[in-house]
Amino acid sequence: MGDDSQRTDLAVSDRWQHWKRNFWLGVINGILFKVGITFSHPSTVLAVFLTKLTGSELYAGILTAVAGLGWFLPPMFVAGWVESLPRKLPLYANMALGRALGWLWMIFVVVFVAPKFPVYAAILFLLGYAVYTITGGISSLAFMDIYARTVPFRRRGAFWGLRMFWGSVLGIGGGVIVRQVLKGDWGFDFPYNYALLLSFAFVTYALAWLTFFLIHEPPVEWTPPPKSWREQLQTMVELWKQRADFRQLIKVRLLMDIGLIASPFYSTYAVVKLGAKPSLLGAFIIAETVGSLLANILWSILADRRSNLFVLKCSIACAAVPSGWVLLLTLLHYSFGFNVLPLYPLTYFFLAFAGTGIAIAFTNYVLELADEAHRPTYLALSNATESGMMLLPVLGGILLHYVSHSVLFSIAFTGVVLAVWESRKLKPAFVYEPSHSEALKVT
């Protein structure tokens, strides 16, 4: 790794002269997004909405798959083109428009279609969500490239930590609102109560997009020529062959992703099997928000003072707790007759505590491995290798017709334990910025 003097020189160069302004605009952007997710979390609010709308948990699994595939797969096809763009902010703006249209379509479906045609509404809702996630996946390449060129290395842990910390603080209030709306305190019955939550989410997302538009994007030092899809695929193959450290990271992530088979069903399990009322989702969201809040204090400090790799290993170990906790609650409920619902929100505390650390550390670790010229390709390749795993929630929804929820939770637990074992092989990244000629060697 380069020494601190090198990073100091970088931080005061012309390229980084606006980094403080960009840093805080990026933080505000993240806070607003975090609040928006509180109103419309796919694994809680939207999963229960589709289950209640259709009477089937399968649609909740499809929703999670759409979220993952839309976010992870499209970047693989456009990464080469994105690399060649001298400025990435216009792409982010165009994709924000697509995300806005997709979200407004979802609200329209809930208000005008869901009351009379629930199954058709679920399908149309998923189509709108697909538009939102696909455009979001493409915009993520622009976002991460701008982020890597605007936030100095030693401030990246604080950047993500502040985004998630203050987003979580405000998200606690959002969780209270979700609980009140779903209880009927605001005077809206199903499905209009969910349309109200989606509207709240849209307002915060729109403010987040507008905030990011104000960022001063520094010029790139060099951009490669546009690549055809075949050339881009060849670049990905070469990167994959040359970087054993990157392959090991992806192996760990894929094992961890086995936990996705159960992710949308923690909330539906509580409602369908344990008898929880939908208003308990507010407690889930509050617990998740508190978990994220506390995790940010810990993980962001450790990311800057120790390393992103250290945080990644610790948070992967913590990721085994949620599925193990639900299995324990299931045992207490069915074998001993305990009322476990008061303890069930802790599931979301544990999910957020682990997930926050992974969110802070994983992408930062990928950026540490990547050179500037091929940063979008590393991100796209990382996303593409995960895309197939995004179908696991659909498989989980199908399996629930034949096996119990406990089987899904056991599969999730096993996958994360294997990821913990494999994460021992991850090594600190060597951070450097190659010359143009060095960058071209990969292609």
Question: What is the role of each PLM region?
Answer:
Residues E57-L58, F153-L162, P278-S279, E372-S382:
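Loop-to-transmembrane helix entry/capping segments in MFS-fold secondary transporters
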Residues G136-V151, T356-A370:
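Intracellular juxtamembrane helix-capping segments at the cytosolic ends
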Residues P74-R87, L182, A295-N308, L400-H401:
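Helix-to-loop junctions at the C-terminal end of transmembrane segments
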Residues F310-I358:
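C-terminal transmembrane helical hairpin of 12-TM major facilitator-type secondary transporters
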Residues L97-V119, A317-G337:
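C-terminal ends and interior cores of transmembrane alpha-helices
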Residues E83-L101, L162, R305-A319:
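Cytoplasmic membrane-interface "Motif A"-like loop-to-helix N-cap segments
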Residues G2-L73, V82, Y92, A96-R99, ...:
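Helix-loop boundary and gating motifs at the non-cytosolic
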Residues D3-K20, E217-K251, A439-T443:
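Juxtamembrane intracellular "pre-TM" segments in multi-pass secondary transporters
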